Amino acid sequence: MKRLEVSNQAKLPTQFGEFCIQCFREKGSNGSKEHLVVFTPNFSQNPLVRLHSECLTGDALGSQKCDCGGALQIALERISKEGGLVIYLRQEGRGIGLFNKVNAYALQDKGYDTIQANEMIGFKDDERDYSIAGEILEYYGIKKMRLLTNNPKKIAALEKYAEVTRESLIVCANEHNQGYLEVKKLKMGHLL
């Protein structure tokens, strides 16, 4: 592993079943870039994989502004039944960080969409880097996977490391995230 330090594995009992967890720390980051993999003990040669970027507001607080928390819940439920892993990347706010994400949220509250808000505070629509996920896939020896995503950038990034078959991820829209999902589809090319 060129850029990563790897932790021990530990058990993680959840509402969806028993998982294992393992942490990957980017070397030289002083612990600020630690990524988590949540996986079933014995996944197949063609596992179900969810590449999920951290979303504190959606994953932990249940925000209805995005579809992140729902996507993570669906992924964990499916993976517990079908076998596979969630690669949980610490790339809050599509890579802009929590502080900047809250500032972008404030602009969204004023009527700007998610892309406009990011651009107004000096960022691209998506600042994430998925190369770390490729190294994690290599660590587990994954050469073929069923990727649970609607994001074509994730598919393209992981095809550099493994054979990818996309499986769509259906998260219900609500009154708070309907516009956000439309922007993801129309401006970001998500396969919704």
UniProtKB/Swiss-Prot annotation:
Instruction: List GO BP terms, alphabetically.
Output: riboflavin biosynthetic process
**Is Transcription regulation one of the keywords?**
no
How the cofactor is bound: the record states: Binds 1 zinc ion per subunit.
Q: Entry's CDD domains? A: GTP_cyclohydro2
Annotated positions binding GTP: R50, L51, H52, S53, E54, E92, G93, R94, T114, T149, K154
Q: Which residues bind Zn(2+)?
A: C55, C66, C68
Q: Indicate the enzyme's highest-level EC class.
A: hydrolase
Which Enzyme Commission number(s) are on file for it?
3.5.4.25
Q: Which GO terms describe its cellular component?
A: cytosol
Per the UniProt entry, the signal peptide is none
User: InterPro entries recorded for this chain?
Assistant: GTP_cyclohydro_II, RibA, RibA-like_sf
What this chain does, per the record?
Answer: Catalyzes the conversion of GTP to 2,5-diamino-6-ribosylamino-4(3H)-pyrimidinone 5'-phosphate (DARP), formate and pyrophosphate.
Q: Which PANTHER family match?
A: 3,4-DIHYDROXY-2-BUTANONE 4-PHOSPHATE SYNTHASE (PTHR21327:SF18), GTP CYCLOHYDROLASE II-RELATED (PTHR21327)
**What family is it from?**
Belongs to the GTP cyclohydrolase II family.
Question: What protein name does the entry list?
Answer: GTP cyclohydrolase-2
- Provide the species name: Helicobacter pylori (strain Shi470)
